[in-house]
């Protein structure tokens, strides 16, 4: 079986790339799972990029117009008049993108595991049958623990965390607001989030440990017995190099195209999918990584902010919350906040002279990590 492009991994990003390429190229998608979905993923995507990327409206479960940020002892909220982000049904998103790709001519191999490369071909296995798929280009969109990345000898420098998310039945009347909790007494690895699906169901999660998530549930006055679904997964914050080698490219989580501040990877991966399509059209994968330069800068910036977060104790976080909850800071955030571009939001804050001066009095480390 010979194709122009074989995509290994039929998640949201792999299926999005298949949709971009199908109709123009002969495309195969090799997916190990027998059905879509299943990954621990809150599935929150910035509204602007959701529309820009032409993602399926039928996958949207809820719309968010604002967020409430909590520290141990204080809080502030950011609100806009229009939806800033959408929560999606991951399975519905992946399936809808696959359906689009198939209608345009892509061929899917579900329940088919990629074993490695043999004589320039992809060796795969479906149940007890082993066979080969040949292509001019191969794309590894097979997640953080990418087998394709291992096969091409990609080097990884990253921090890996386990993520845990539960769906909880409760009272979530402010269903258009996401809650973000920053409390190192509960979890010193990451923040906790509450993202309502509707007024009676929410996705609640964190990265680090399941025990930290259970501690947070108790703080939020919710019980473990209100959980109706538990999911777990892994994430990597850092760099995996190279993103392309010969006729093989890495995309999405496989390339660690992941936001270090929120662990979201869908948008970065899909934006890089456009760069990869251009590279495939040119027949030259060597230009792919350069075309994703802005995404790489965003990841590098996010890694610096994450280092700062890890270096701060809770007392300094409380003092920074005092600054962020000021009307001056909220005005800046509401004016410049971009759900998918954290660098834009944070840069706007540190470029504000009075806010920067106050923050530097709390932690001079800002100069090392953010002011460049």
Role assignments for model-derived ranges:
Residues 316-372:
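C-terminal auxiliary extensions adjacent to catalytic cores
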Residues 114, 207-279, 286-291:
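FAD/FMN-dependent oxidoreductases across multiple families
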Residues 14-15:
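N-terminal Rossmann-fold NAD(P) dinucleotide-binding loop
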Residues 278-318:
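Active-site-proximal substrate-binding core of FAD-dependent oxidoreductases
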Residues 6-8, 19-40:
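Glycine-rich FAD pyrophosphate-binding loop
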Residues 1-11:
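Beta1/beta-strand and adjacent pyrophosphate-binding region of the FAD-binding site
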Residues 47-96:
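A conserved beta-strand/loop capping segment in the N-terminal third of enzymes
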Residues 10, 100-225, 256:
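Predominantly flavin-linked oxidoreductase catalytic cores and closely associated redox partners
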């Amino acid at each position: 079986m010979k194709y122009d492009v074989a995509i290994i991994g039929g998640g949201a990003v792999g299926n999005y790339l298949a949709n971009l390429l199908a109709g123009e190229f002969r495309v195969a998608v090799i997916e190990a799972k027998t059905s879509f979905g299943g990954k621990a993923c809150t599935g929150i995507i910035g509204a602007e990029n959701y529309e820009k990327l032409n993602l399926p409206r039928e996958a949207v479960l809820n719309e968010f117009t604002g967020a409430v940020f909590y520290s141990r002892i204080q809080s502030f909220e950011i609100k806009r008049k229009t939806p800033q982000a959408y929560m999606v049904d991951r399975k519905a998103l992946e399936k809808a993108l696959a359906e689009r790709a198939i209608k345009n001519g892509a061929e899917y191999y579900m329940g088919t595991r990629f074993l490695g490369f043999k004589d320039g071909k992809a060796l795969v296995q479906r149940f007890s049958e082993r066979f080969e798929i040949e292509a001019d280009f191969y794309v590894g969109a097979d997640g953080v623990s990418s087998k394709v990345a291992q096969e091409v000898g990609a080097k990884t420098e990253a921090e890996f965390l386990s993520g845990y998310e539960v769906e909880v039945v409760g009272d979530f009347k402010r269903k258009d607001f996401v809650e973000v909790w920053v409390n190192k007494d509960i979890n010193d690895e990451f923040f906790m989030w509450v993202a309502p699906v509707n007024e009676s169901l929410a996705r609640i999660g964190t990265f680090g440990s399941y025990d930290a998530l259970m501690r947070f549930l108790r703080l939020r006055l919710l019980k473990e017995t209100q959980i109706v679904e538990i999911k777990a997964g892994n994430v990597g914050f850092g760099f995996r190099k190279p993103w392309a080698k010969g006729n093989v490219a890495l995309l999405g989580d496989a390339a660690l195209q992941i936001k270090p501040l929120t662990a979201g990877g869908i948008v970065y991966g899909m934006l890089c999918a456009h760069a990869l399509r251009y590279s495939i059209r040119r027949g030259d994968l060597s230009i792919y990584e350069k075309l994703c330069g802005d995404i790489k800068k965003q990841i590098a910036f996010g890694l610096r902010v994450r280092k700062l977060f890890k270096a701060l104790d809770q007392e300094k976080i409380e003092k920074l919350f005092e600054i962020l909850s000021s009307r001056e800071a909220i005005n800046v955030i509401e004016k410049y906040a971009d759900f998918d571009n954290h660098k834009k939001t944070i840069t706007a804050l540190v470029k504000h002279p009075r806010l920067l001066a106050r923050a530097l009095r709390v932690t001079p480390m800002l100069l090392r990590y953010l002011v460049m």
